[in-house]
């Protein structure tokens, strides 16, 4: 929503599952045709990494089938599509940063379904961009920062892993990066974006409660 505030010259449609079920092919195609959509930015996903192992069908439906429907509808309407993806398309064992040229190697249902979703988007829409990000947080929705703030108020102590390293990324910064891609003209391909610096989930939690 930061894009709408900073770039009000465009018309934006923000949808949730009540307004548009992106798993419903007919609903997607009808909506895009009626609204004359020129660009789709898909931020929707099944993001419960652990639960995805037991809910593989739902994860596949939301992370793979839904992006395919969006991409197909975008292509039919002459629209571009940006698919927001994840660092989980890699297994996290590398000791150097992952670049766009690195071969994906997911080791979870979540990562696998997100990778398949990337492929579907690239296969079904000529003007397609995949942007991978990591450890996303925002004032909207559920995310690690909001969870830690809530748990910090409810509990005297918290147990947080310290051996997983990543880069927390502010959703507003990701939105601005997406707009930069749009503003310069959609160049088909895969992009990586995150904020700077690295930390563990433990370090991140400590920083959250210092603020």
Regions found by a protein language model. Name each.
Residues 119-166, 171-173, 179-180:
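NAD(P)-dependent short-chain dehydrogenase/reductase
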Residues 61, 65-69, 89-131, 135-136:
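Catalytic helix-loop patch of NAD(P)-dependent Rossmann-fold dehydrogenases
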Residues 15, 40-44, 81-86, 91, ...:
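SDR active-site strand-loop-helix element
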Residues 1-39:
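N-terminal Rossmann/SDR dinucleotide-binding element
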Residues 25-62:
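NAD(P)H-binding glycine-rich loop region in Rossmannoid oxidoreductase-like domains
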Residues 50-57, 92-96, 141-142:
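Conserved catalytic-core motifs of eukaryotic protein kinase domains, centered on the activation segment
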Residues 40, 54-82:
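NAD(P)-cofactor binding segment of oxidoreductase domains
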Residues 1, 177, 184-211:
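Mid/C-terminal beta-alpha module of Rossmann-like enzyme folds, strongest
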